[in-house]
């Protein structure tokens, strides 16, 4: 269930004891965002099972499809840094209402477990919204979906069966 509160609400702190540190790291990352086209700065901070925090920010490109969201940047930094299991990700924007992760980021976060905690925060207010990947992406397309997928029908079905 997706919950709402503030940076100091007991529920938020109980859900993620290092919340303040993660919010600070995400804020620094947001300030470093390369958002020259939209001006929309997003920062992210991931906590791994070893207690290491990995940061990411959005990086925009004139070729819009090449833009990298802060969440995907943080995941890439965590994986490249040899992270343990991912425990939580905190994102921040300057919106009054916390902005949620886009669908592509939710899908990528699902690769790291349905219980991964996602916390979205506002730098303009102290509002937060949080829940697990399963809350944010119900019935997501997961690795198990590939294991049960039927073979394709059509002209290439025979070659797919041989591969």
Regions found by a protein language model. Give the residues of each.
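Short glycine/proline-enriched turns and hinge-like loops at secondary-structure junctions
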Residues: 37-39, 68
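Histidine- and/or cysteine-centered catalytic micro-motif in compact active-site loops
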Residues: 47-49, 58-59
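Short, well-ordered amphipathic alpha-helical segments that serve as non-catalytic structural scaffolds
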Residues: 25-28, 70-78
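C-terminal binding/interaction regions
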Residues: 2-35, 81-163
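Small residues (Ala/Gly/Ser/Thr
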Residues: 26, 43-44, 56, 74, ...
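Short beta-strand scaffold segments in enzyme catalytic cores
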Residues: 39-48
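Compact, glycine-rich, soluble single-domain proteins
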Residues: 57-72
